[in-house]
Amino acid sequence: MTKIQKTIDFQVHFNATIFSTILRKRRFSAEKKGDFTMSVDVTKMPKLGFGMMRLPEKDGELDLEQICKMVDAYLASGMNYFDTAYMYCGGKSESIVKKALVERHPRESFTLTTKLPQWMMDEGIEGRDRIFNDQLARTGAGYFDYYLLHSVEDGANYDGYVKYDCFNWARKKKEEGLIKHFGFSFHGTPELLDKILSEHPEVEIVQIQMNYADWDNPLIQSGRLYEVLRKYNMPFLVMEPV
């Protein structure tokens, strides 16, 4: 196994996103959120995503040459899902996505997810728009295949997303063609997850932490979260799979 292959193997196992295959399509009635169809076709997703959170460094900076090789090898394997966020790698992850992926591969050849951090929206609603515009500029992607509210959890975090009307705002971004699918990554309780999914049928996908070790963990409660997702027939992504 080459050095690059070993690095990719480490990256996939410790910073990957694994996908469930629960649902093909959902339709909501006009009485709820209007007559619209949400179609997250998980059958088209790869089994492993490429997480852009923990990336190799050289001399204190992200190692672009190494990252490009990893991205190329991942795409060559037939997989195409990349996950980043505004704050990853000290705020440099989205920019490295532009250099290693967006500028080097056709836009239609990959799927890109990024996330909105409520705790960095210092200006409130204006901060929400500033961050989103920064993300478009940083990545150069033109649009995001998946856009997630980042690390939703009980308390002030979720209250902030509600206060700044992020759910309706994201739907408008979808109508503008800047987001294809909308959801959130989640670190809260099963009760909060149930509340959000019951109140926001516009949500198309959820990302949770799930693995065998955390299935009955009283802090993470992977098993109970999974049951809530099944209740709503909700497609989901898995972080921290091993």
Protein language model features and the residues they cover:
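N-terminal binding-site loop/beta-alpha segment at the start of enzyme catalytic domains
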Residues: 8, 17-110, 169, 175
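Beta/alpha (TIM)-barrel catalytic core signal, keyed to glycine-rich beta->alpha loops juxtaposed to Asp/Glu
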Residues: 34-35, 152-242
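Structural preference for beta-strand elements that scaffold enzyme active sites
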Residues: 45-49, 80-81, 109-115, 143-148, ...
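Acidic-and-aromatic substrate-binding clefts and catalytic sites of carbohydrate-active enzymes
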Residues: 58-62, 85-95, 119-126, 155-158, ...
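Short, acidic/polar
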Residues: 61-74, 124-138, 188-197
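Generic structural signal for well-ordered alpha-helices
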Residues: 71, 94, 98, 129-136, ...
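Structural motif corresponding to the early beta-alpha repeats
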Residues: 104-129, 150-153
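Active-site groove signature of glycoside hydrolases
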Residues: 139-157
